[in-house]
């Protein structure tokens, strides 16, 4: 098709153009074109100049005059041009298929180098020559950069996207061939060639199978497929029947038959190897079972031997059940039993023997000794079978009686450490025997024991102490001894003391060394009982027991604090209210009652008592005597008499000496006719001044003596001590916000958790912890409890 160029500004042939437009109504209005384009979308057929051939929504064409720059042949020939001719001349023909599109893309003119333009002239001035590359050394591109334009309405893949230059470069690089289309340029991985497995000959297969020999005909078939084999030999009894047919067998048939034989032979070889491996395993397993059978047979024979010894001991056990048998006779009959227990680890010491010899020995002892121990008179024969028990303990605690254990292959013998920990937590067989046989008997006898006669019980327990394990001893103390001693402490009443040996310390002190760590619990009960007795105690009844003996038993001056809090205020009140200093008729009953408590307090505390409450009265009486009608002889005798009344150990007290020195100074001032310094007036409200007067002297005395106490310093409250105790032992001390019904004391709960369902309810009174019994009502009297008992209670729970 030949295209013609039209000049829109030409005015020639206007009449012809108008007639053509009016006749054919070629172009629709702009609005109609836009409307129809929106409706048809991509399905509309429109040429590049906007001409539309569809009859849908056709509108009136423009009537502007059109003139042609170069007239067509029909116009030159003065022919009439119709609308169809104009559309045919200026519209793009419809492409029927993709090949037409490709052919159209090939007809697009190629870009050429313009040799007459301004750019070409500038390049020529800079030394560029056509056909060479750019740059000083002509190393740049030699051709212009080309652009590839896809035709309109043509998708990807319809035409080649590369330019001709890019295709040449790709062919030069080897990416595509000259005749290869671009859509087939995807690289493909080369297929992996399978390596052929080398064929084995019959000899190699027979060698792999070990002692198995291939039949001759199979070996011939296998070797037939090898390269150097050209013939096959048939081993058959009827060779004539084969004839020429067997000789003329083709090579392909031979190879196929050989492959079948080879596959079958390889299957046989694999099965043969499996059978050989199974055979070796069966031999090894048979050897293991045989060895294990022999070991078990030896173990069974030794077990039967051990059982025979046990039955022998059982048959002779009737000798120990005779009640008329004497102690010496029974101990002699125990000698074979001792020999048996000593020889057990010797006869059964093999590492393969997993017998628990200690369990066997303890079972024998429990069976044989149950009746003799049941009939044992503990108090009459306290050392019955003691030597035998000592021998049994040494034997059972030796390593020979422990079960034999194979050496562990674990790192650093971790399992051994675990076993040691378990041994520390559980009872051994010997400990179980002593717990349920010996402890049971001793516990029953201790229930009949009189608490005041501690010597027999202590002799019995101390004699058996080397034999009794520590766990059994602790259980005996907690279950049988401590309850009896605490019961005696709670029932102790100093008013009912009839004999000297009825003192509480005569019953308790002998047990303290044996109790060891449990002694604190007992002393706490004693301290509670002292508090219960001293609180209502009347001073005029005299001193209670010998507190100086008890002071050394308590740690942290617990007894001294109790006496200073309960008894000392009563002594001060008695001295202030009832002690009268009368030189004419002196009554010393109150004075001696106060002196009876001298051993209960420390020397400095008791001296402070006289300095604060006795000497103010005594000095006031001496001052009045010397100032009114002085009689130096009588005053001197009265002074000397009072010094003789004081015991010598108390007279050497620094406070007592200071008081008498002040009286002597007053008499010397009177003899020298000097003005006598009046002592501070004594009154109930003036005791503070008296304390201030002697405060400086007190500090001087404390520097001289090592046995001093800071009595004036405030003590820590008992509640603070209880709270500190609970905090140190991870216990909660929680106030309940209610009080006890009878005493009015605040109630608290001591527990390990915040739950109300756990713990004990207590109240504090007179430095004592009072505990509510489990399940008791609110009006039930509370029981005293010590710190150690609280710990034991929560540890057991």
UniProtKB/Swiss-Prot annotation:
GO molecular function, one term: RNA binding
Compositional bias per record (Basic residues), positions renumbered to this chain: 186-199
UniProt feature, compositional bias: Basic and acidic residues: 159-185
Cited InterPro entries: G_patch_dom (IPR000467), GCFC_dom (IPR022783), TFP11/STIP/Ntr1 (IPR045211)
Annotated keywords: Cytoplasm, Cytoskeleton
Organism (species): Schizosaccharomyces pombe (strain 972 / ATCC 24843) (Fission yeast)
Any one Gene Ontology cellular component term annotated for this protein: U2-type post-mRNA release spliceosomal complex
Protein name: G-patch domain-containing protein C1486.03
Family: Belongs to the TFP11/STIP family.
Positions of region (Disordered): 1-33, 159-204
Superkingdom of origin organism: Eukaryota
Biased composition (Polar residues): 1-12
Compartments in which it is found: Cytoplasm, Cytoskeleton, Microtubule organizing center, Spindle pole body
Keyword Cytoplasm appears in the UniProt entry: yes
Domain G-patch: 115-161
Keyword Cell inner membrane belongs to the record: no
Predominant subcellular localization, coarse grouping: cytoplasm
Gene Ontology BP term (one): spliceosomal complex disassembly
């Amino acid at each position: 098709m030949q295209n013609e160029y039209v000049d829109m500004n030409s005015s020639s042939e206007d009449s012809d153009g108008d007639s053509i437009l009016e006749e054919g109504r070629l172009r629709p209005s702009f609005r109609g074109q836009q409307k129809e384009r929106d409706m048809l979308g991509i399905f509309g057929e429109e040429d590049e100049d906007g001409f539309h051939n569809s009859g849908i929504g056709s509108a009136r064409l423009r009537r502007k005059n059109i003139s042609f720059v170069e007239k067509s042949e029909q116009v030159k020939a003065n022919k009439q041009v119709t609308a169809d001719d104009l559309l045919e001349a200026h519209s793009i023909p419809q492409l029927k298929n993709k090949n037409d599109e490709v052919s159209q893309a090939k007809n697009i003119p190629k870009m050429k180098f313009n040799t007459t333009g301004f750019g070409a002239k500038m390049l020529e001035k800079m030394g560029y020559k056509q056909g060479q590359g750019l740059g000083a050394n002509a190393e740049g591109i030699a051709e212009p950069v080309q652009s590839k334009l896809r035709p309109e309405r043509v998708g990807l893949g319809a035409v080649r996207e590369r330019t001709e230059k890019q295709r040449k470069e790709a062919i030069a690089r080897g990416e595509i061939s000259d005749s290869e289309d671009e859509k087939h340029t995807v690289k493909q991985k080369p297929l992996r060639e399978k390596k052929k497995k080398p064929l084995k000959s019959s000899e190699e297969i027979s060698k792999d199978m070990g002692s198995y020999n291939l039949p001759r005909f199979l070996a011939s078939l296998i070797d037939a497929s090898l390269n150097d084999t050209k013939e096959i030999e048939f081993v058959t009894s009827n060779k004539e029947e084969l004839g020429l047919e067997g000789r003329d067998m083709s090579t392909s048939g031979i190879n196929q038959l050989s492959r079948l034989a080879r596959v079958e032979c390889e299957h046989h070889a694999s099965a043969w190897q499996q059978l050989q491996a199974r055979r070796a395993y069966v031999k090894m397993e048979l050897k293991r079972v045989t060895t294990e059978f022999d070991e078990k047979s030896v173990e069974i024979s030794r077990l039967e031997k051990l059982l025979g010894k046990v039955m022998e001991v059982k048959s002779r056990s009737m000798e120990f059940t005779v009640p008329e048998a004497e102690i010496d006779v029974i101990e002699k009959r125990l000698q074979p039993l001792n020999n048996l227990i000593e020889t057990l680890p010797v006869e059964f010491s093999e590492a393969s023997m997993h017998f628990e010899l200690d369990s066997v020995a303890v079972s024998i002892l429990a069976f044989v000794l149950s009746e003799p121990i049941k009939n044992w008179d503990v108090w009459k024969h306290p050392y019955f079978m003691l030597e035998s028990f000592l021998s049994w303990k040494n034997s059972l605690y030796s390593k020979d009686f422990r079960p034999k254990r194979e050496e562990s292959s674990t790192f650093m013998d971790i399992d051994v450490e675990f076993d040691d920990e378990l041994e520390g937590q559980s009872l051994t067989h010997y400990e179980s025997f002593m717990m349920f046989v010996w402890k049971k008997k001793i516990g029953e006898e201790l229930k009949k024991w009189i608490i005041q006669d501690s010597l027999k019980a202590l002799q019995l327990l101390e004699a058996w102490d080397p034999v009794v394990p520590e766990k059994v001893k602790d259980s005996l103390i907690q279950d049988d001894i401590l309850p009896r001693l605490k019961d005696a402490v709670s029932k102790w009443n100093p008013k009912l003391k009839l004999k000297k040996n009825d003192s509480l310390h005569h019953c308790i002190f002998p047990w303290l060394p044996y109790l060891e760590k449990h002694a604190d619990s007992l002393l706490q009960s004693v301290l509670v009982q002292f508090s219960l007795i001293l609180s209502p105690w009347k001073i005029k009844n005299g001193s209670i027991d010998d507190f100086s003996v008890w002071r050394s038993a308590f740690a942290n001056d617990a007894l001294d604090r109790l006496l200073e809090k309960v008894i000392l205020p009563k002594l001060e009140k008695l001295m202030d209210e009832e002690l009268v200093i009368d030189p004419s008729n002196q009554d010393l009953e109150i004075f001696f009652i106060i002196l009876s408590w001298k051993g209960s307090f420390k020397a400095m505390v008791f001296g402070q008592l006289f300095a604060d409450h006795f000497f103010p009265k005594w000095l006031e009486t001496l001052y009045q005597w010397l100032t009114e009608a002085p009689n130096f002889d009588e005053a001197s005798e009265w002074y000397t008499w009072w010094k003789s009344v004081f015991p010598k150990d108390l007279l050497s007290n620094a406070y007592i000496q200071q008081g008498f020195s002040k009286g002597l100074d007053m008499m010397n001032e009177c003899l020298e006719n000097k003005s006598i310094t009046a002592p501070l007036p004594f009154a109930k409200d003036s005791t503070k001044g008296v304390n201030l007067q002697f405060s400086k002297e007190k500090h001087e005395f404390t520097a001289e003596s090592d046995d001093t106490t800071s009595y004036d310093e405030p003590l820590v409250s008992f509640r603070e001590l209880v709270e500190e105790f609970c905090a140190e032992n991870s216990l909660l001390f929680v106030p309940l916000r209610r009080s006890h019904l009878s005493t009015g004391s605040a109630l608290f709960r001591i527990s390990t958790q915040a739950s109300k369902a756990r713990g004990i309810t207590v109240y504090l009174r007179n430095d004592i912890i009072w505990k509510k019994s489990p399940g008791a009502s609110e009006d039930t009297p509370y029981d005293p409890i010590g710190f150690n008992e609280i710990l034991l209670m929560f540890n057991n729970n």
